[in-house]
């Protein structure tokens, strides 16, 4: 059953988001991101005195049609130093902002390591990183390590014939 959840911001503004009992906090953050343009990773939601954890359902948190959640937007204006480990096991430090895309980081890596962007891909904690996603969506922390993987190059077609 769908119902409207009231989301209140620190400045006093509020808005409604259509939700269901089985929806998770992560899904709610994605809907809020679509509605107000603040990326999910920058959102902190609270109900009464508890910070809402991403994997939990709204019903398990006791939220219902008359509930209001508080939205706090985390500032991401400070750069973050991360490591990118290449295929030889060497790591380089990169200054990034969580609001930048993976593609932006790939451009930096490409320039420093002299490897074309289409010849490698990046992963963090075993998860492939998509070019158009924001770095903040991956939960990067200061001094964390992103892995650079070389793409396999194709052969010449009918050489075995």
UniProtKB/Swiss-Prot annotation:
UniProt induction comment: By type I interferons.
GO terms under biological process: defense response to bacterium; defense response to virus; integrin-mediated signaling pathway; ISG15-protein conjugation; modification-dependent protein catabolic process; negative regulation of protein ubiquitination; negative regulation of type I interferon-mediated signaling pathway; negative regulation of viral genome replication
UniProt xrefs under InterPro entries: Ubiquilin, Ubiquitin-like_dom, Ubiquitin-like_domsf
Record site feature (Interacts with activating enzyme), residues: 151
Domain Ubiquitin-like: 2-76, 77-155
Keyword set, alphabetical order: Antiviral defense, Cytoplasm, Disulfide bond, Isopeptide bond, Repeat, S-nitrosylation, Secreted, Ubl conjugation pathway
Post-translational modification: S-nitrosylation decreases its dimerization, thereby increasing the availability as well as the solubility of monomeric ISG15 for its conjugation to cellular proteins. Induced as an inactive, precursor protein that is cleaved by specific proteases to expose the C-terminal diglycine (LRLRGG) motif. This motif is essential not only for its conjugation to substrates but also for its recognition by the relevant processing proteases.
Cross-link (Glycyl lysine isopeptide (Gly-Lys) (interchain with K-? in acceptor proteins)): 155
Pfam family, one: ubiquitin
Region (Involved in the ligation of specific target proteins): 151-155
GO MF assignments: integrin binding; protein tag activity
GO CC annotations, alphabetized: cytoplasm; extracellular region
Residue ranges annotated as motif LRLRGG: 150-155
Propeptide feature ranges: 156-161
Chief place where the protein resides: cytoplasm
Subunit structure: Homodimer; disulfide-linked. Interacts with, and is conjugated to its targets by the UBE1L (E1 enzyme) and UBE2E2 (E2 enzyme). Interacts with NEDD4. Interacts with PARP12; this interaction inhibits PINK1/Parkin-dependent mitophagy.
Domain free text: Both the Ubiquitin-like 1 and Ubiquitin-like 2 domains are required for its efficient conjugation to cellular proteins. The two domains play different roles in the ISGylation pathway: Ubiquitin-like 2 domain is necessary for the first two steps allowing the linking of ISG15 to the E1 and E2 enzymes while Ubiquitin-like 1 domain is essential for the final, E3-mediated transfer of ISG15, from the E2 to the Lys of the target protein.
Function: Ubiquitin-like protein which plays a key role in the innate immune response to viral infection either via its conjugation to a target protein (ISGylation) or via its action as a free or unconjugated protein. ISGylation involves a cascade of enzymatic reactions involving E1, E2, and E3 enzymes which catalyze the conjugation of ISG15 to a lysine residue in the target protein. Its target proteins include SERPINA3G/SPI2A, JAK1, MAPK3/ERK1, PLCG1, TRIM25, STAT5A, MAPK1/ERK2 and globin.
UniProt name for this protein: Ubiquitin-like protein ISG15
The species this protein was found in: Mus musculus (Mouse)
């Amino acid at each position: 059953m769908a119902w409207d959840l009231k989301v209140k911001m620190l400045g006093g503004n509020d808005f409604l988001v259509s939700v269901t009992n089985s929806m998770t906090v992560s899904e709610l953050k994605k809907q809020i991101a679509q509605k107000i343009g603040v990326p999910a990773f920058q959102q902190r939601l609270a109900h009464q005195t508890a910070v809402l954890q991403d994997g939990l359902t709204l019903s398990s948190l006791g939220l219902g049609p008359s509930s209001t959640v508080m939205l706090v937007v985390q500032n991401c204006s400070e750069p973050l130093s991360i490591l990118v480990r290449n295929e030889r096991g060497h790591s380089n430090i990169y200054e990034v902002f969580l609001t930048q895309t993976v593609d932006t980081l790939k451009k930096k890596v490409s320039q420093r390591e002299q490897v074309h962007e289409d010849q490698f891909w990046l992963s963090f904690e075993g998860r492939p990183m998509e070019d158009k996603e924001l770095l903040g969506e991956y939960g990067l922390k200061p001094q964390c390590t992103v892995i650079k993987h070389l793409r396999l190059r194709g052969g010449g077609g009918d050489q075995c014939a």
